[in-house]
Amino acid sequence: MEVFSRGDVDAILSYLAPTATWWVGGGIEGISGTKNKEEFGAMLAGLSATTKSGAIALKPLAWTAEGERVAVETESYSEMNNGKIYNNLYHFVFVVRDGKIDEVKEFLDTEHTRAVFLG
């Protein structure tokens, strides 16, 4: 989660397998749905550019790991260029294979996300 908080998209992508997929819940155009590694990187770069610090800080609150699956409850915080504060709660489910993240499911408060990024 530390690498996310720095906003270094290339470093973030280095943790993903070449065929990784990242799914975000909800119906937010440009954010929700399934993305491949390249699409996810483009989305991250775009979102990071909307923040004052160039990143959305992520703080893990609780972890559960079993086999190749890791679930993480997380809180984010960022001051946005539009003057709003992005402070969301997430549940991430990671599937790790051969030392790389292969699949991610991201559950979050979509209404807060929509209000901050699109409102």
Model segments located where?
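A short hydrophobic beta-strand element
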Residues: 67-76
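Short beta-strand edge/turn micro-motifs at domain boundaries
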Residues: 92-115
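A solvent-exposed, acidic/Ser-Thr-rich amphipathic alpha-helical stretch
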Residues: 17-68
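Short, cysteine-centered beta-strand-loop-beta hairpins and adjacent loop/turn segments enriched
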Residues: 78-85
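Short acidic-aromatic low-complexity motifs
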Residues: 1-19
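Short, surface-exposed coil-to-beta transition loops
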Residues: 56-58, 73, 86-91
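Hydrophobic beta-strand positions in extracellular immunoglobulin-like domains
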Residues: 76-78, 96
